[in-house]
Amino acid sequence: MQIYNTLTRRKETFTPLDAGRVRMYVCGITVYDYCHIGHARVMVAFDMITRYLRWRGFEVDYVRNITDIDDKILKRAEENDEPIAALTERMIAAMHEDEGRLGVLRPDREPRATAHVDDIVAMVQRLIDKGYAYPAANGDVYYRVRRFEGYGKLSNRDLDDMRAGSRVEVETAKEDPLDFVLWKAAKPGEASWPSPWGDGRPGWHIECSAMSTCCLGDTFDIHGGGPDLVFPHHENEIAQSEAATGRPYVNTWMHAGAVRVDQEKMSKSLGNFFTIREVLEAHAPEVVRYLLLASHYRSPINYAPDALSDARRSLERFYNALQGVAPVAGEVAAGYRERFIAAMDDDFNTAEALAVLFDLARELNRAKQEAPAHAPALAHELKELGGVLGLFGQDPEGFLQAGAGRLPMSEEDIEARIEARAQAKKAKDFATADGIRDELAALGIVLKDGRDGTTWVVEGD
């Protein structure tokens, strides 16, 4: 099995520290707001990885933390006039509901930062004792970045370049502008915990170093997260953990790709920011999961109406193949399983694995017509391999009937109307072209004109 390692910037043969057992830590969310579609990407990617490793016979200890104390949490609780614990419990429950709808299995352990403050304080003290950290005059404790020789190895950054590009610090308590906070002194009225340096709360980076090593040991197999965490969060985790323990922190670093919306970066300022629950109000959960798996986990995903329509149509093809066949385990001679494993063993290439499943679905459709006796075994194979990805778990009839009412006319008729509109536009008969567009819009079919022609989506799909 080959996995791309962000640290070495290449694919490597994956060999767990303990034969047959994988210890994996993934950075979870800061629970001050609802999860967005970018969080869903990370959740689904590492759920897929966990499912596949277990299917291949590994025992997986999957740990994903919860950051339940942070500046953003304090600010949101104050804005809401809500106790911090009430806010975080509400958001944790919402996260579990969202990921459950997406078919994401719960991690084995979900450590919370507030439950590990003693471990965090102990790690900070160890770093001070070793000369890697220092208490400052303002009550904060900072990490000495230049003291750690390997700083920048994950993000491939040079310290001097970082120093040259850093802004002038208003806070003069640091020895060096590159130093980052491990422990924040509490302001009056803020949530805080006692420490040798005064009441305060942990910095974000040290939380993950302490929780991951407490749960999985000083060195473990896989550390994952979103693409925005490579620097500074994961870079700082390495610096903290390896300085504290004197050992390599993580063998394989994995990062999921970003989610873009209509080819733009997702952000609240652009108005293209979507929470998972907003997305699931308009789209079936399995359609969203399929979209998130249709590309390689490291590739960026474009979240757009036509991409969701493609995902729905792909699922309909699979469920159409499975419809009317009772799956029964049996021999399937065409090597689909071997091809599926080869794709997934190549850095969890779900795009290639789904291509294999499309071939299997085509053979199942042929067997239903030409060799019905072979269909049950093929259906079983398709259900099992799809299940490894967390797909095809619904009753085919139910899935197809749920989507049947969405199209007010056949796809062939829609395409014919689009072609008639194109001909009208070519003849400069814009009244007819606009009339066709309006006619389809009245039926809930939205046309999108692009450089490569016209595509269509069902409104609200």
From Swiss-Prot:
Record protein name field: Cysteine--tRNA ligase
EC primary class: ligase
Gene behind the chain: cysS
Assigned protein family: Belongs to the class-I aminoacyl-tRNA synthetase family.
Organismal lineage: Bacteria, Pseudomonadati, Pseudomonadota, Gammaproteobacteria, Oceanospirillales
Residues the entry annotates as binding ATP: K268
One CC-aspect GO term: cytosol
Self-association state and partner proteins as the record states: Monomer.
Enzyme Commission number, as recorded: 6.1.1.16
GO molecular function: ATP binding; cysteine-tRNA ligase activity; zinc ion binding
Binding of Zn(2+), residues: C27, C208, H233, E237
